[in-house]
């Protein structure tokens, strides 16, 4: 009874290194296609809206790019990207920052502006998506 169990265990252990190396090789091949995220740090903080009372926002934003080369180019243009986003946020109202649908619309507009800016500077949009990691407003 012990012999079949020991034999099965030995067989499993002998095959384990080949399974382990196959699993390790897969991420390397997939790594070339994985997107890279560029966090805009520090978070964007400013005021928005018009009127006698100041309203503030804080936005933690990440930009999705295709690879590390694109990430390097995006990081180089980060001051210009931050400026575009700050100007966009300054134009917002309570309605455009208060509702989920409006925030999605703002996210899409922010992505479009970042892509246009990079298109002008690099000849390609480079950024495939823009994510709000955190968006806090104080109306």
Please place each PLM-identified region on the residue numbering.
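Flexible, low-complexity charged segments
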Residues: 1-139
């Amino acid at each position: 009874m012990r012999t079949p169990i020991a034999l099965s265990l030995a067989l499993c252990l002998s095959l384990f290194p080949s399974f382990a190396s196959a699993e390790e090789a897969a991420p390397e091949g997939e790594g070339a296609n994985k997107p890279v995220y560029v966090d805009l740090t520090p978070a964007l903080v400013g005021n928005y809206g018009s009127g006698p009372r100041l309203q503030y926002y804080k936005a933690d934003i990440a930009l999705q790019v295709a690879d590390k080369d694109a990430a390097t180019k995006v990081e180089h243009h980060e001051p210009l990207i931050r400026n575009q986003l700050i100007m966009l946020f300054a134009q917002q109202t309570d309605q455009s920052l208060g509702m989920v649908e409006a925030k999605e619309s703002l996210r899409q507009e922010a992505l479009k502006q970042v892509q246009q800016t990079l298109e002008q500077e690099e000849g390609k949009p480079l950024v495939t998506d823009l994510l709000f990691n955190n968006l806090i407003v104080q109306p």
